[in-house]
Curated annotation (Swiss-Prot):
Tissue expression profile of the protein: Expressed in roots, leaves, stems, siliques and flowers.
Residue spans, topological domain Cytoplasmic: 504-942
Transmembrane residue ranges: 483-503
Span list, region Disordered: 437-471
Glycosylated residues in this chain: N86, N99, N158, N164, N171, N230, N285, N363, N397
Organism: Arabidopsis thaliana
Positions of the catalytic residues: D717
Necessary cofactors: Mn(2+)
Phenotypic consequence of gene deletion: No visible phenotype. Reduced auxin-triggered phosphorylation status modulation of RAF-like kinases (e.g. RAF20 and RAF24). Tmk1 and tmk2 double mutants, tmk1 and tmk3 double mutants and tmk1, tmk2 and tmk3 triple mutants have no visible phenotypes. Tmk1 and tmk4 double mutants, tmk1, tmk2 and tmk4 triple mutants and tmk1, tmk3 and tmk4 triple mutants have a severe reduction in organ size, a substantial delay in growth and development, and a decrease in fertility. Tmk1, tmk2, tmk3 and tmk4 quadruple mutants are embryo lethal.
The protein's name in its UniProt record: Receptor protein kinase TMK1
Annotated GO CC locations: extracellular region; nucleus; plasma membrane
Amino acid sequence: MKKRRTFLLFSFTFLLLLSLSKADSDGDLSAMLSLKKSLNPPSSFGWSDPDPCKWTHIVCTGTKRVTRIQIGHSGLQGTLSPDLRNLSELERLELQWNNISGPVPSLSGLASLQVLMLSNNNFDSIPSDVFQGLTSLQSVEIDNNPFKSWEIPESLRNASALQNFSANSANVSGSLPGFLGPDEFPGLSILHLAFNNLEGELPMSLAGSQVQSLWLNGQKLTGDITVLQNMTGLKEVWLHSNKFSGPLPDFSGLKELESLSLRDNSFTGPVPASLLSLESLKVVNLTNNHLQGPVPVFKSSVSVDLDKDSNSFCLSSPGECDPRVKSLLLIASSFDYPPRLAESWKGNDPCTNWIGIACSNGNITVISLEKMELTGTISPEFGAIKSLQRIILGINNLTGMIPQELTTLPNLKTLDVSSNKLFGKVPGFRSNVVVNTNGNPDIGKDKSSLSSPGSSSPSGGSGSGINGDKDRRGMKSSTFIGIIVGSVLGGLLSIFLIGLLVFCWYKKRQKRFSGSESSNAVVVHPRHSGSDNESVKITVAGSSVSVGGISDTYTLPGTSEVGDNIQMVEAGNMLISIQVLRSVTNNFSSDNILGSGGFGVVYKGELHDGTKIAVKRMENGVIAGKGFAEFKSEIAVLTKVRHRHLVTLLGYCLDGNEKLLVYEYMPQGTLSRHLFEWSEEGLKPLLWKQRLTLALDVARGVEYLHGLAHQSFIHRDLKPSNILLGDDMRAKVADFGLVRLAPEGKGSIETRIAGTFGYLAPEYAVTGRVTTKVDVYSFGVILMELITGRKSLDESQPEESIHLVSWFKRMYINKEASFKKAIDTTIDLDEETLASVHTVAELAGHCCAREPYQRPDMGHAVNILSSLVELWKPSDQNPEDIYGIDLDMSLPQALKKWQAYEGRSDLESSTSSLLPSLDNTQMSIPTRPYGFAESFTSVDGR
């Protein structure tokens, strides 16, 4: 009887488990059929069998439970079924590089899921509970999706086994979560969040993290990067194109660091020796910051991108700084190297235009840093500048004590440290030194008394004991009366002072504008250097009848000696009479015309000081729909864009109905002139090395536009006539952002000016949909033109060859037989050159893929072209050739005040996987660095 009962119990349990297993497998069947319906794959896809476990790219267990869905790179469209969350045994969901749209369904509860790959699709939203209950999750890749703005959810905390989190170009907003540190994710090694909308500072909770690859570039992140010095596992750090500031940290603990990209930030101070001595370092990019001190010297094995002129080094080549510069930098170090000082304190002579510095016969006599929002302490290094007569540090946020070393200055007359947060005893200065410490409540008190719980009142008296209590009681009523009387008098005095200030301000404005230009004046706004309301610091070296200024002159108080005065001019907008502008263009003479286009005519001009400019006279129809304020707002955005491969917009001119843009002058004209009209113009044909370099220049400029953290631009009309060359035969992209100035609505001429047939991406021409991939397509056409020497549309050719892109792809399919005939006959084809041309041709084919998602980003193009420019060098270089390019040369700095430089991001890559191609041609262009996830695209890391 007992045996029978046991047998029945066993049989019941077995049948129950069998039925549950059957129910689970039926649930998987239902979920997979829903997935098939929502994706609607073609019949050739291999999903026709009624059993999903027999479908291609699907892996199941022996009990028919689905564990893997691996359908990446399949060209699938449609949406994802919410029934996916029922696949409770699913371990890998790989859907990358498709065209799937709609929301990402909730995956909460998929406790077995280890890998989630959704990159490079068109998903538009992601639920907040997407990671809820995913306790086995190890890798997340959701890059390059047009999600609605979202923040990394708290539910990610459940995935404590996470090793890789990649969400580049995924519209992530908010701040970087503090829970991404080692306490929650001890195994996290890849953290990629490039090109999103993250703000705030790096959380200190990242300290101790073993992350090896950190991509946070292209955001709005601020603050310092001190936390990096405690992330000792780092191998790759890309923080470029943010708003980081402060000095670089100590890198001595980062023994495995190989690649460091910090370009396009506001870092200050010297490059630390700990970075220079790293044995593991291979690539470093520090261009376009405010780094100071001597030019750093890295090991010969390190690929360095460090444009000397885009930082604030004392010299243009390695060498010791002037002793005066060394002392001033040590002083700045106590203030944590303020950006405002770093922007001004450039070069090796502090007596030439350094903000707050005045000299006599080459000796520093005055340091005036009042109202500079300084923090930190007063450096003892002030005492090393023996010629100092005045030190003005008032109205800042300085702490600490006044250094004893200042008393040793033999020529010191004035020390003003008023309105700070200093404490401690004031050192004994000579009797003839005027010391102003007003506005420091704790001056005269030592630090121990300030930190004591029973510290004295601000007056300094302890008042302890019985007598003290009695004194306080006796003083109470008189003090109360004094407070009332003082308040009344103080109020009356305040009203009087305010009235006086308003009167002075009014009189000053009358005086300031009484001699200004009439309504005919043209305002040329200088390049933006910071806040919209911030004036530009200029130094007046002379005067001119053609250039006036609105200025205030400030003289340091307390002296009548001329040599002791510091004069600084606050200049707002430069005023240039319209007669001057007309004069330099011969009244907009046709002889001065450089070219014309959809936006208007461009004239050449030369200012009185020899500076050449290009004046674009906008067509009335282009901007008729724009109000003054709107036009000014649009231009204000454009003037913030600074890059060495973008034509500098110096300012805008307004005079009645006329609206003019003032650009830097590019003497060698358009790329079109050198590529298609060289023979008629009497020019030399472009060498292949020149074409490569020009292509790289354009790619870098457009990459910068696409990656702007504060305002993303799409050019929409990229073509050779919008690419201008300087005397050094380096390229700059012109007319970027001008489509924004065109009026909107059906009457807009945007369709005429926002693109040129032959360069238009198919989706833009058909639907008007604009993404950065529109520019990528145009760039691919330009690459084809550089290779063939033919125009994008050439009606002189046979009908089947008129359209360059179609003809080029047909020719390239048969590389050996026909493609060599398609190459420009002026290019000298040796073996190395031909290999280089083939690589660029492959890149051009990718860029001109029909579907936008199949095209790479501009960062990918930069990677490919920069490797060719660096590694492929023709053996026969003619030093007498005026068109020869020294790849190491600096670009000319005709307009330094408004230009900044972008550097290379030659971060190492090697071939691993291939982009899909419409013509099924075998490709050899590397699409991701070795060892990185399959969903990698180079935009993620630039």
